[in-house]
Amino acid sequence: FVEVSEAMSLDCPPGSAEPWLPLIDASSDRESFDKRFPEKKPDDVINFLIRDRLNPNSIISCIQLARENARQIRDVLTTEMWEQINILYWNMQEGEAIWNKPRQEQLSEIRRACQLFYGITDATLSKDLAWRFSILGRLVERADKTSRILDVKYYLLLPSLDELGGVLDELQWIALLRSAGAYQMFRKAEQNSIKPESVARFLLLDPIFPRSIRYCLDGISNTLKMID
């Protein structure tokens, strides 16, 4: 989400929070944010989403909760999984080197660490009931994230109706695809120019892209059948 708004901010006046506020809307945290940050500065939005421990949906809060959940089921996890979630948790504490890096590098490092955890889980955890529940949770999370990414675009208002289908509109759709890790696979599936209906169809209905809502729902259904 943050990376989408990072790209969109280039087309807005310096200091404008307009490209960032859709992130707050999409995460349903607008009321809480407005009460605490009435001036709505871009840095306030970014810190609220990434490092704010009072925001239960911030990245750092989610990782803290994930580590606590992992601690409670420590006997189910492999040592490698526990080590990885701890590395991510401790690397995100105040004063750590990650916070001295540019914002894009911070986000990339966090994303890679999360992807590494998924890879370690698939490589080290026996494919038993615990693994199936982890897959179920992952698919639910992905479907929710993709729907929220589409919400971000809904809230990203264009300067005027004349911009619909224009350069700025296309840039927003490209940024949205990249935020879902879907740009390259979309271009392989759709040879024509980027159109809103094509992007929405791909992210909602593509049967083989692992982050499309259809793929996730099919996976959820199949996993529930295996659990049953």
Regions found by a protein language model. Give the residues of each.
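Alpha-helical transmembrane segments and their helix-helix packing motifs
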Residues: F1-D228
